[in-house]
């Protein structure tokens, strides 16, 4: 039986580098390391490598093989090791992996003590350039914000709304997802819960009223927290308030690279 030709391995004569080539939108089950153990989830993966000018194609099947071989719960260290293994497996000097997944935290209501799950959007991005690996943790945290101006000028309450605080943090050490989420929630007018009883609803309403925040306050307070955390090398921080009295959002962004200061 004659050998099956491997067209992908033949040389290319156009002399053009491809910065990223690979697979995108791969859904694959994962386990994620938590503060109390591990949590199953489903990741959406994008995996790319740099292709040199003389190579016709990359080894597409090896990206999936890499996911098949990995049986360790994801954290920053494991994700970094997966990134390095991909480059060896694909014979590449640069590459990028992105994974996003739902992450659940069991939260206890503030008065009744009833427990319920709360979901968050979490992601990890790893990129290798010039031999340097950079890992970024992304969390999207929904919170409550209450308008200080509305509280000041109104005789009957104040307008409030759900807000999204999104942090992309470049890390130099392991940072547990729950820890970062909890620190972000502390900066809001009030955090959210999956299930509340009437005494809890009273508590969160009054908590938000006693702790009003503009969108500017949200990003500045979260930035202050990130500035103090030595595990965070750089960050992009966004807050979006889905205004309850407008048909538009209020938005703010802060970026900082501590390595440059």
UniProtKB/Swiss-Prot annotation:
Annotated metabolic or biological route of this protein? Cofactor biosynthesis; 7,8-dihydroneopterin triphosphate biosynthesis; 7,8-dihydroneopterin triphosphate from GTP: step 1/1
Write down the EC number.
3.5.4.16
Q: Name one GO biological process term.
A: tetrahydrofolate biosynthetic process
Q: Which UniProt keywords apply?
A: Hydrolase
Origin superkingdom: Bacteria
Q: Which reaction does it catalyse?
A: GTP + H2O = 7,8-dihydroneopterin 3'-triphosphate + formate + H(+)
Q: Where is this site: May be catalytically important?
A: 147
Which InterPro entries does the protein's record reference?
A: GTP_cyclohydrolase_FolE2, GTP_cyclohydrolase_FolE2/MptA
Enzyme class, spelled out:
hydrolase
Recorded GO molecular functions are: GTP cyclohydrolase I activity
Q: Which family does it belong to?
A: Belongs to the GTP cyclohydrolase IV family.
Function description: Converts GTP to 7,8-dihydroneopterin triphosphate.
Can you say what this protein is called?
GTP cyclohydrolase FolE2
